[in-house]
Each structure stands twice: as C-alpha cells, then as structure tokens.
C-alpha cells in the first residue's frame, strides 16, 4: 500500500478513536485516554538483552518492561484500535533506539501478517516507528505462513518462525530491526537472519517493551 494511503488510514483510526467514549488505557479512569499517573508509568527505563542469530549475537534494547500500564497500553493499540496511544510510547522507543546506537540506520519493522493487517487496518511496528519521527522501511516479507506464537515455549516459537522471512532489500545498509514486544526473541532472531542473508548489516534490534521473563540489564 502506498505510504500516503497508510498515513491516511492511520489518521482515520486516530480520529475515530477520539470520537468514541474513552477511558484510561492503563487504569480505566473515565474521560481520559491516558491519565497522568499512567503516563508517568511509561517513562523510559531502557534495558538490554541479547539474542542468538546466524552470524552472531545481536543486542536487543527495549524501552519498558511489558507489564502493568505498558502492557495494557500496547494491548489497547493492538486489539482495541486505539492508535493515538502510540504517541505515549514514542519516548520509550526513542530511548531504546538511542541506547542501541541506531543513529541514521534504516529502521526495519517486523512484517505484519495479512490476517492481522486486515483485522486491525494498520501495522503496529510501523505505527510506532512513525511516532518517533522516522520512516519504516519494509525490507522483510513473509516467505511462508506461521502459526500463532501465543502459548508456545521458546523452542516451539523458534521452530514456528524458522525460515519464515526473506529480505527484499537492504544489502550493504546498516539496519535496526523494530518490533513492539520481545518475548523469547525468536521473531527478532529470524528477522536478523533474513536481513543478514540479504546482505544487510544489522546494528541491533529494538522494541518498545520486553517481557519480564527474560533477563535484562537496566541502564
């Protein structure tokens, strides 16, 4: 879909969200999209972890822990169409990018399945990248269909996504992989593999949030 149509679609989703009855995404306080207390809970707290990928270990920087308010806000964006809340997560993603040394590297969001895109009408990683004032570069596409990752353990997740992505460009470019949440790192690892196979230089991976189940180093 052309970039201008994507932007229009996201703007329409934001406008629709403003017209609907609203409550705080973090605590359900009425008549406010995000209350002051919950907004403060989204203050960046960057953390680093590493994932294994063909070609070497990759650092993954996340701006928040995926729990509490952060988890509820992300779910509201993904499952309730509340795209305007992405603005509140922009500082966390920006902090992760800064710690990752992204600089002027190309930001490559994980692709969204056709089914998810049809259901939501927008791509969450792309939406988040735009909210930090950057342009997402769709250099990855699905080579095959994958199953739902929810409920799978680490090994099952890795098998589910193995060889599922292919790079469509990026050879010789410095790239940073972007997603909303990292759980086991299987999807990010597959993205790194595909980009490296296509000749890209992967600087790091970044996410808005990381599940607390993985060890992370706070900085």
Where are these regions (language model features)?
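Glycine-rich phosphate/pyrophosphate-handling loop used in enzymes and phosphotransfer proteins
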Residues: 1-219
